Amino acid sequence: DEWWGKGFTEWTNVSKATAQFVGHYQPHLPGELGFYDLRLPEVMRQQVDLAKHFGIGGFCFYYYWFGGRRLLERPLQMFLENPGLDIGFCYCWANENWSRRWDGLEDSILLAQQHSPEDDIAFIDALADAFRDPRYVRVDGKPLLIVYQVALLPDAAATAQRWRRRVIELGFDGIHLVAAKTFDMIDVSRYGFDAVVEFPPHQTAMQDISGEFQALNLEFRGRIYDFEELAKRFGKEDRSDQLLYKTVMPSWDNDARKPGAGHTFVNATPRVYAAWLADACRVTASRALPDHRMLFVNAWNEWAEGAHLEPDRRWGYAYLDATARVLSRYYRDPELNDRLQAHNAGFVKRHDAAVVVHLYFEDLYLKAGGGYYFYSDTLKL
């Protein structure tokens, strides 16, 4: 309330977003779950049930830690206290400074990171209860921890060493450290980490096609990219010199957070997403060790960035359906297809055919007179 105004949530930006150019899909409005409140236990129960129903194995939660101070911790604590939410989970430390970046004020820091050897130890101690949870994701028997911007750590290698020593002291077999491939090129050996996880749209060599679109907002200064081109290329990429976890995104558009200045991917559809996911699954399935056959989706519910598997009013369950259909080729869950068929059987079929009328002809013109209507020799509306 102090920083953003009383009652502000992500939904504030999501609901007021508007189209910035012709064909721009905004706003992204939620479907089944509505404008939910994550402080309510029943909401998280719905999310877990929905994810499991469509074959998703776990959630990666952002963890906000600023020199001992936590933010947005209530949903995570609620999850830990409810073992009935039977789905895997892990943490990604969002280790940036907390700033007013949504307003475009990059230097207006609200809460800064505070790094020290003592804070490294305190950070691991704060995570210990989650690491002990049987639902927590482990790789080679070690709890997995992702760091969003490893290059921001003053001495990442020293921090990694302290973390490894501390988890051993706490009785764990070690820790599996993963650097997110965000703003910097990552060499895990340099930072003392074990693996890298892709984080599209970061580090993706995007194709800018902004000039192909007509702006609706004359002050629009955002960027428009081709999702389909990215999906065809990025899903097949792999590296042999370090362990790389693949990540797929269903779509992306952060204009809700940065009106008129966002980055938007067009041509994002469930079909294109499914093809990207299938490519990433093929790469992941080739891993020699089962624990390394792990794949991420960005994201489950980043509504203000247009990246969500949760149902919306445009696509409904199509992205979840596409996810389940692709995973069913690789995921050893014999009941997944049965659940998918049962879910789809519940939809009401309203039409047997779709009629598409092309209304653009050379002899078609717009006439004003008591109202607007289109007219041609053969068609009048």
Regions found by a protein language model. Give the residues of each.
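ER/Golgi luminal nucleotide-sugar-dependent glycosyltransferases, focusing on the catalytic module
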Residues: 316, 325-381
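Glycan-processing catalytic domains of CAZymes
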Residues: 1-344
